[in-house]
């Protein structure tokens, strides 16, 4: 498992190419292109095209995970990597847990049949099948409710929450702290000044102010 450095608009494609070039065997590129967890950043159209071209060049498969795509409350939608796929090397996945209820652990995946068949076997080994009642709830919701109206309501809820959070960060945070301003999704990534101790910060936040902050090291391959 190799982490790829991030920058505004997505992963650094030159670093990705170096990793792909030096890797042998089967290669899988995992991306969350929209409102990525944990940065809240969205991969640009140019980055998506570059990642797909690198996958083609080095015979890699892309897993495009899009759990937050329907939660865009600002800006313009960016076409999926899957929409660029002419070689059958992109798997596209999503979930109902972010748009219906967190407890509904129901997801979906689209991709080449030969890969999907292998995924089905792995899924069956893992838990036989997804909870039938959860699947039925999702089915009934999709077929009997106005999904677009539901999405619009969710977007407004998260727009207000994000705006409130950013307004307070603008008001109370030091100018030395930088942070992302997402156009959707659930996440904001804050960067403390050089020399700060992240674990001390998180401990003090929860102990003194009852605010839980997830340290960035939790999302790093090398915990740097």
Predicted features along the sequence, with ranges:
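PLP-dependent class I/II
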Residues: 1-224
């Amino acid at each position: 498992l190799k982490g790829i450095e991030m920058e505004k608009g997505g992963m650094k494609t030159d670093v990705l190419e170096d990793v792909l070039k030096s890797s042998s065997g089967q290669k899988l590129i995992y991306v969350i292109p929209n409102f990525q967890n944990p940065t809240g950043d969205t991969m640009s159209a140019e980055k998506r095209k570059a990642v797909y071209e690198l996958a083609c060049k080095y015979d890699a498969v892309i897993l495009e995970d899009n759990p937050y795509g329907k939660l865009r409350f600002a800006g313009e939608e960016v076409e999926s990597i899957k929409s660029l796929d002419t070689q059958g090397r992109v798997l596209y996945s999503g979930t109902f847990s972010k748009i219906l209820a967190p407890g509904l652990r129901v997801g979906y995946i689209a991709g080449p049949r030969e890969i999907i068949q292998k995924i089905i076997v792995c899924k069956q080994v893992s838990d036989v099948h997804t909870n039938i009642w959860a699947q039925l709830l999702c089915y009934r919701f999709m077929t009997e409710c106005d999904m677009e109206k539901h999405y619009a309501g969710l977007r407004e809820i998260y727009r207000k929450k994000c705006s409130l959070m950013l307004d307070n960060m603008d008001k109370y945070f030091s100018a030395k702290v930088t942070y992302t301003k997402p156009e959707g999704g659930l996440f904001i990534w804050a960067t403390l000044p050089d020399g700060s101790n992240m674990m001390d910060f998180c401990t003090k936040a929860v102990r003194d102010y009852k605010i839980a902050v997830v340290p960035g090291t939790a999302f790093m391959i090398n915990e740097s």
